[in-house]
């Protein structure tokens, strides 16, 4: 039985990967009167007087909404909200299993930005944070931006920022392996969608050198026609040498390649034109180039999104800890500084003794990672003065 059929069978057996569990059993009349009526009226009155008590008198302080419109689910595309539910349930299970964070899946049946933003904003008082998931670009940029403006809790599009953080951590350690210098690197990112643009912006914020963005038409340059808002924004701060051409042209002389695009776009010959290349081919399930092919082309470090190859670059190492730390200090937002701190903390988990070309990140199954990321994020929030607890 292949993995798809085995997964389907497991889902049929489980009939859902998460459940609601009461934190206190209701067995006596006293239990009933304290946890529900009449006693529950008192915490209601307290919250009505002091809104902040909604975080201390309810589970809100540890509850994240995982929300999709089903428009960009995995590599399946626009399959609709109901079909996106298995992924949202899985995400919630990972939140709990790796970060101890309670999460609830919500699949919203609209592609209209106004309706989606309004719906999420209206239910936001039930949660301590919002994790946006599998919303297609470029709408995802506007949805996140507008929600940040109207919600008083952190809003985080994991496809963008979780991916960017784990890629940044992987690059930091690939630099340690190869001896490359951050400010002198040329990094080519193929795929100018949600993940690619977020990766580019974070790497630029961290001080990485020349970031060159590519899409299906090749290198993105400032002034190109037909760019969406996200691509237009990053075109102003990337490609500082004003290069033109195809992906192969961009890779010539590059130090690193980050692929968040489509299978089999890169060849060994293209990798051979790089300088001691770092290759992160993250298209799933088939990467832009297979690891053995990249190494045949001379790649020094290779990572993919898959668990069956070394150096899995998976954002499960990021989002549980990001939210755990943010919720712990009740920060209203997840800032650029908190993302950078998370990336550096994740990279630092790999010691000099452990570090090698085939080991640049901790295991995606290492449950200590979330605590490390959470502590770093919480400390950064305190230092920035945005912690409320």
Tell where the protein language model's regions lie, with residue ranges.
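Adenosine-phosphate binding glycine-rich loop
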Residues: 158-159, 281-389
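Glycine-rich phosphate/diphosphate-binding loop of Rossmann-like nucleotide-binding domains
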Residues: 74, 79-99, 151, 157, ...
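Short, ordered loop/turn segments at secondary-structure junctions
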Residues: 69-71, 79, 108-109, 134-137, ...
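Solvent-exposed alpha-helices and their adjacent loops that cap or buttress functional pockets
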Residues: 55-60, 96-97, 122-124, 148-149, ...
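N-terminal ligand-binding/catalytic initiation module
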Residues: 1-155, 374, 380, 387-388
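Rossmann-like adenosine-cofactor binding region
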Residues: 232-300, 306-308
